[in-house]
């Protein structure tokens, strides 16, 4: 939020809305860290928005000349929503990295491609094939989700008190400074931009849960082994711990994501309660999604596939090979273009996971 307030002042000075001296002073104060973040959050909950106590802190550091130009023509939701988009950029950067690690592990598993497997439909043995088939069905949806991440938009929120942009001079300056999409129409009660981002994350989590569930089943049947956890009661047990962790985190994700995706509509020009609930959800969405991808990635890193005692018809082997070849080529292209999202803080992964 401090970053947004500082960028707002700088952009308004660039556009001639406030004096440059005030903007420089505000921006300098906004580079400071709040001395008590926990107290800020507590006061923000009491005040109804964390922006109010944050502005009190910034005002205490400003000269009388700079005070009138702080938070000029903005409303609290502008600051919170824009800060949330900056946070979501960081979340996507972490998730893209974790997804890339998983895709790389799967791509490396092409070494098992020709191993015979027994396919299963409705969990029952079906037809012999090769691991190329299963590899394709694991990897292709992940690549789809990664491409959806690349197309995601993180819009600026700047609508003023009631979302009519009254008195504001619109320019691209603020959006460009924050590397956000310059959406002209405010979205105070149109939460589709937030829903869209959460649903993209949901695609990754659903993919991870599907693969983790498959790994648990294959570990049970002895068709795959991976890093195992022990048991306090049964020394012979070797539990597929990483896959289990991924399933648990995915279940938790869907619970907190529903706060966004199943929210009641936001009323009129500014919502009462539904918007505030997002503050609880977004950090938990980031934590549970990254935990899911991290866990399934660790499972894939240690995964060994075992050959089934079946004879694969040549035609089925060829069909599976063709599917895998196209998917692996696509994976190598996507991994080759993998790059971090534009953002200032690349250390966020440790804070999220």
Language-model features and meaning:
Residues 20-24, 33, 44-46, 51-53, ...:
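Catalytic-core signal marking the mid-to-C-terminal active-site face
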């Amino acid at each position: 939020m401090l970053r947004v307030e500082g960028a707002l002042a700088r952009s308004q000075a660039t556009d001639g809305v406030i004096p440059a001296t005030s903007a420089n002073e505000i921006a300098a104060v906004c580079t400071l860290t709040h001395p008590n973040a926990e107290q800020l959050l507590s006061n923000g909950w009491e005040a109804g928005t964390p922006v109010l106590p944050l502005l009190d802190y910034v005002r205490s550091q400003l000269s009388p000349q700079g005070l009138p130009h702080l938070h000029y023509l903005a409303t609290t939701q502008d600051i919170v929503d824009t800060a949330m988009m900056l946070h979501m950029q960081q979340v996507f950067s972490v998730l893209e990295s974790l997804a890339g690690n998983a895709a790389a592990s799967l791509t490396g598993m092409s070494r098992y491609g020709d191993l015979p497997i027994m396919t299963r439909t409705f969990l029952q043995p079906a037809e012999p094939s090769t691991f190329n088939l299963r590899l394709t069905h694991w990897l292709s949806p992940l690549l789809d989700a990664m491409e959806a991440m690349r197309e995601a938009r993180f819009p600026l929120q700047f609508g003023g008190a009631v979302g009519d942009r009254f008195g504001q001079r619109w320019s691209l300056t603020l959006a460009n400074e924050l590397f956000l999409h310059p959406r002209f129409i405010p979205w105070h009660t149109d939460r589709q931009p937030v829903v869209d981002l959460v649903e993209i994350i949901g695609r990754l989590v659903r993919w991870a849960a599907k693969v983790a569930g498959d790994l648990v089943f294959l570990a049970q049947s002895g068709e795959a082994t991976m890093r195992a956890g022990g048991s306090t009661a049964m020394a012979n047990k070797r539990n597929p711990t990483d896959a289990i962790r991924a399933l648990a985190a995915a279940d938790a994700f869907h619970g907190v994501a529903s706060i966004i995706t199943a929210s009641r509509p936001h009323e009129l020009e500014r919502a009462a309660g539904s918007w505030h609930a997002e503050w609880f959800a977004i950090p938990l969405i980031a934590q549970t999604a990254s935990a899911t991808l991290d866990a399934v990635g660790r499972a894939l890193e240690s995964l060994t596939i075992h050959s089934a005692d079946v004879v694969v018809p040549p035609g089925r082997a060829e069909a599976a090979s063709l599917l895998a070849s196209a998917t692996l080529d696509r994976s190598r292209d996507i991994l080759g273009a993998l790059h971090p999202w534009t953002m200032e803080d690349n250390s966020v992964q440790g804070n999220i996971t």
